């Protein structure tokens, strides 16, 4: 074959490779296995799972944990994972869905048995790393998963404080010279340990043709812990937790957009609390765009409004009192799943409702830059006030377009069990998942 023919073939293959990347973006579906144990309308079945898998390219089972004593990866719900064989039940779906990659995730803020076991793992040296790597590979292989998702539970940025203009000016000065409020004085050492762990873990998994992905949890400072240029070659893809920038647990006294696409300027907001900043950070670190998946949540964050919060609902909302009461399905303070949020929107069934069942006022974002919110001002007694920041199918679709236009790897959905998987709102099952998939096509 002549040199010109070789060159022509090489160029053709390069074009085809680019087309393949752009034509088949990732839709990484996280599955919190706790959903299988919920009751009533919140219970997520294997039938629900199979419907969702029509839209996913990857299914990530959450979550395993780390034994703080010996640094081995282990189940944190042995009754469900092992005794009821739910791990095997989920991975067995590979037979019917061979085009989907099934990964097992470790960490993900679900491993609450020990406060700092992930830092201990990093500091455990080669012997501790080896125990973790061998146990992780064994667990992944034993239950026939295609790889491992590493969702390290590392120290978080300190939340934004509420203060006036003078405090804001001092904060900006302090941040410029000292960074984003240091929470880990050994972060540079830990960054090197993370790099070593990822490289060794990747090498071990590759021996068995297993995948390795990294999930960067919300409010973990990527620049502290991840040497992006060094670890990117060892990772198949990276899921960015680009949501929960503000939550009622971290920011109880004021409510604001929890997952904006772009910076919402003014009012003492921090410039890195948005999807665009986090994505650009990784791109500027020379990480290939097609390895980056942006995260979208299927739930909203909810604050309790008081009489002092006013009645406009316009963020930033002052004088909130932490998390709003839990929803009837999700049963977690400060959080409502998409079906619960949708049920609070004005509809024939709640027109005359009062108290906690009264409808909320929905405020859309026509710019698609910051996100939608909904609220119910507190009544004359100061009760039943509610403020919700959320993504809906429209804004999720817009974020998927963000990924597509920038030639990113795709989207990671957190998670399937918080979507309206029963179609309670509009009879459309998995509306968030579908909206993202259709935009990525």
Swiss-Prot record:
SUPFAM superfamilies in UniProt: (Trans)glycosidases (SSF51445), Chitinase insertion domain (SSF54556)
UniProt GO BP: carbohydrate metabolic process; chitin catabolic process; imaginal disc development
GO CC terms in record: extracellular region
Matching Gene3D superfamilies: 3.10.50.10, Glycosidases (3.20.20.80)
Other facts noted in the record for this chain: Lacks the typical Glu active site in position 153 that is replaced by a Gln residue, preventing the hydrolase activity. Its precise function remains unclear.
Disulphides: 29-56, 342-425
Species lineage: Eukaryota, Metazoa, Ecdysozoa, Arthropoda, Hexapoda
One Pfam family recorded for the sequence: Glyco_hydro_18
GH18 domain span: 25-441
Keywords of this entry: Developmental protein, Disulfide bond, Glycoprotein, Secreted, Signal
Sugar attachment sites: 221
Designated name of the protein: Chitinase-like protein Idgf3
Annotated signal peptide: 1-23
Role noted for this protein: Cooperates with insulin-like peptides to stimulate the proliferation, polarization and motility of imaginal disk cells. May act by stabilizing the binding of insulin-like peptides to its receptor through a simultaneous interaction with both molecules to form a multiprotein signaling complex.
One GO MF term attached to the UniProt entry: chitin binding
Subcellular location: Secreted
Region annotated Disordered, chain positions: 309-331
Chief site of localization: secreted
Organism per entry: Drosophila yakuba (Fruit fly)
Gene name linked to the record: Idgf3
